[in-house]
Amino acid sequence: MTGIEQKTPVGGSETGGADGLYAVLPLRDIVVFPHMIVPLFVGREKSIRALEEVMGVDKQILLATQKNAADDDPAPDAIYEIGTIANVLQLLKLPDGTVKVLVEGTARAKISKFTDREDYHEAYAAALQEPEEDAVEIEALARSVVSDFENYVKLNKKISPEVVGTASQIDDYSKLADTVASHLAIKIPEKQEMLSVLSVRERLEKALSFMEAEISVLQVEKRIRSRVKRQMEKTQREYYLNEQMKAIQKELGDSEDGRDEVAEIEERITKTKLSKEAREKALAELKKLRSMSPMSAEATVVRNYLDWLLSIPWGKKSKVKQDLNFAQEVLDAEHFGLGKVKERIVEYLAVQARSTKIKGPILCLVGPPGVGKTSLARSIAKATGREYVRMSLGGVRDEAEIRGHRRTYIGSMPGKVIQSMKKAKKSNPLFLLDEIDKMGQDFRGDPSSAMLEVLDPKQNATFMDHYLEVEYDLSNVMFVTTANTMNIPGPLLDRMEIIRIAGYTEDEKLEIAKRHLLPKAIKDHALQPKEFSVTEDALRNVIRHYTREAGVRSLEREVMTLARKAVTEILKTKKKSVKITDKNLSDYLGVEKFRFGQIDGEDQVGVVTGLAWTEVGGELLTIEGVMMPGKGRMTVTGNLRDVMKESISAAASYVRSRAIDFGIEPPLFDKRDIHVHVPEGATPKDGPSAGIAMVTAIVSVLTGIPVRKDIAMTGEVTLRGRVLPIGGLKEKLLATLRGGIKKVLIPEENAKDLAEIPDNVKNNLEIVPVSRVGEVLKHALVRQPEPIEWTEQENPTAVPPVEDEAGASLAH
């Protein structure tokens, strides 16, 4: 083979005395004896090169076991000096780069020294000769070895019985000793010791010694296994007899038990205030139960049914508190702000105090995460004196989870509504249906349609669960649902009273942190109020620079972080107290995560700040436009959905129709391409409320007039230049305030909504209502575009279409 130095033949003499030069193959976890044919898998580069070398000469290699199997590149002193000279019978390269080789041991050899060869291990070694010995003694030993080996194989199931037949036919006692040694389950050093012994008599004695020790251990193992097996058989027999005895006892004495059980159920039916239909159903099932064998499967189904029917509350009502002042105190103590919700609850209690026939209201609290929708429901239950049960609808896809499974199915149960009523133990609890906008639907049905019956005040008095098969009155239940968005099926939405919970203002968050989050953090972390304090300025900085959310969930996490670090500091430094101020805040929370009140440094052409409303609150939306030489195409990017792309198209058409008024020569549209991009391309965006921002960006690009950096805007635009109203005004104004922008343009028709905006928000912003695009440009552009005179050419070019770009939803 190429690259082989032909100085000395690789492969030495098998006669004793003279050393031969051999390529060495270090072995891991195996000792190869003479007369053995063994397959080996070789993966190390040096070993593969050694094999390739010997395949090119006379196919002999020295197999020597290394002392540490974990050593990838063993040094000469890490390899045992006694090895086996072997013939390479077959060599096969595998696809993964390793080599499968079949070797046959021929003779023992002793390594005298290793060469300095680096590409593979190479050593001088001499084949070892066996000494002459007493043939009679060896034959006697051999017979004992064969006999013991037969017993060993019988006890050790890992060795094939055919090996015994092969061993008994071997006439060469040296080969017999090596064959037996290779099959013994002994450690590598012990096998190496067997290889190192030249005397056949000593090898046979060692094999005999190892086998006798192993046979005694294997016999003990066999006895243990037999004892365990007998014990298991005895246990199983006892279990079987016990079960038989129980069955016989049931047959003999169950008539008494059965009568007692039936009598108990009958008594429960009498005491429970069931409806007429439910009582008839219960008595009919009881009659069936009387005629059944108590141990039958049908009897178990009937008993479970009656247990469910009698366990749910029938006419058991909590006494609803009607003290309006108490209710107001509870709601105010546990939640700051949320005036509309509190007002609605107090109104309900006031009406209930005058009329007992009023049905429970079905409220739907819609707002971003972390504003307190779920915790508010618990406070309402406390204020009204009702039991509180919660059912999460997130990810519910099966109608049976609402209405239950029919009794024909094995293991059927009532739906979650009836299960929750059983848990409440009263027929008029406050029932929270959490995340109602997260319900899905699939081939098993539409759970939102099943909820129609639950949430309709005129239908839920006769709610029918598939398992119970009788009507159950839910009209006294006070249902409260929560959702992040209004993405709820229309018929379901129509049955609920929507109460929007907008995001909190900075001052509201500050009050919540002082009144609720800080005391909670102190309590949860086993601190004393004097040990841990946070200044008002520090809390305000946490709100501004470490959180950006509509709710207070992230704010709570940051306050908890401060408390944890305070506890750690007190225990480590033995301080008596930790005070967090705006100066040392970054030592505890790290670098600021968000900018507050910092806007881009200069007015730019084609860069407009729009406003977006998402399910997690309001956001600033940067809109960028550029113009380049082209053929009048318009490109839109930024993961925009259809409504937003149509809004850009309408804005472009409006600007083109009024080009002369904006000082733009109409032919410019056919000679230039415009690219409108909304950054953060990974976030899907949709909605029409960025219309006036799109118009401003396009006009700025075409005229070269910069847009003011300190102004934000929101409003839908029409082809006639009118500005239409938008939703989510409070959330958008809060986002404007967070972003440090002082002036905001809103549609004139939204001016009436300003009455519901907190005064501290309105006082910190200059809010300008606008009704037409002209007013928008007057406020937004650094200077007004100058109209020009233009004579229209023949065959005017049509407005180019907007190119499609894919995207997903984000409401504006």
From Swiss-Prot:
Active-site annotation: S689, K732
Binding site for ATP: G367, P368, P369, G370, V371, G372, K373, T374
Induction: By heat shock.
GO molecular function, one term: ATP binding
Stretches assigned to the Lon N-terminal domain: 22-215
Example GO BP: protein quality control for misfolded or incompletely synthesized proteins
Primary subcellular site in the record, as a coarse category: cytoplasm
Domain Lon proteolytic span(s) in chain numbering: 602-783
GO CC field: cytoplasm
UniProt-annotated stretches for the region Disordered: 787-812
Top-level EC class as recorded in UniProt: hydrolase
Highest taxon of the lineage: Bacteria
HAMAP family linked: lon_bact
Subunit annotation: Homohexamer. Organized in a ring with a central cavity.
Record protein name field: Lon protease
Organism: Brucella melitensis biotype 1 (strain ATCC 23456 / CCUG 17765 / NCTC 10094 / 16M)
Highest classification ranks of the organism: Bacteria, Pseudomonadati, Pseudomonadota, Alphaproteobacteria, Hyphomicrobiales
Gene (name only): lon
